[in-house]
């Protein structure tokens, strides 16, 4: 079931602190809508699940846009891309957004990163009573 969605604009220097989501966010999808920053700004997910593809050699390659460091996966999203994850189980975060905050100087373009989060619970799961959540 769907629970709620959240629309957010990040500005330079803002971050998403490391956390696990509340019960209404059993399954989460984070979608990068648009941005005007020049570098990738990954969302990090701590997870033992490593999504890889086998190459012809004995090495494994990670999918494009995914960076793995130990048990942390950094996912770089282009506008229109999304990532699906278990929000209640997997700690996730973003480091400080790059860039400097322009104090609305005339003619200055404000850097931003626009993201929408969609949250769900399993229909027959232990969190199903959070369907159509009204807390947000």
Report the location of each language-model feature:
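A short coil-to-beta-strand element that immediately follows conserved catalytic motifs
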Residues: 1-6
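An acidic, glycine-/histidine-flanked metal-binding catalytic module
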Residues: 119
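Short beta-strand His + acidic residue motifs that chelate non-heme Fe in jelly-roll/DSBH
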Residues: 16-19, 91-107
């Amino acid at each position: 079931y769907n629970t709620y969605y959240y629309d957010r604009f990040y500005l330079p220097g803002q971050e998403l602190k490391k956390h696990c989501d509340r019960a209404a966010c059993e399954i989460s999808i984070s979608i990068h809508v648009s941005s005007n920053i020049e570098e990738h700004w990954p969302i990090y997910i701590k997870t033992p699940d490593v999504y890889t593809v086998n190459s012809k050699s004995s090495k494994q390659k990670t999918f494009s846009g995914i960076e793995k460091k130990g048990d942390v996966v950094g996912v770089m999203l282009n506008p229109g891309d999304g990532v699906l994850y278990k929000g209640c189980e997997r700690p996730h975060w973003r480091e400080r957004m790059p860039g400097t905050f322009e104090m609305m100087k005339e003619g200055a373009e404000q850097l931003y990163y626009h993201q929408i989060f969609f949250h769900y619970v399993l229909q027959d799961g232990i969190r199903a009573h959070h369907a159509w959540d009204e807390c947000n």
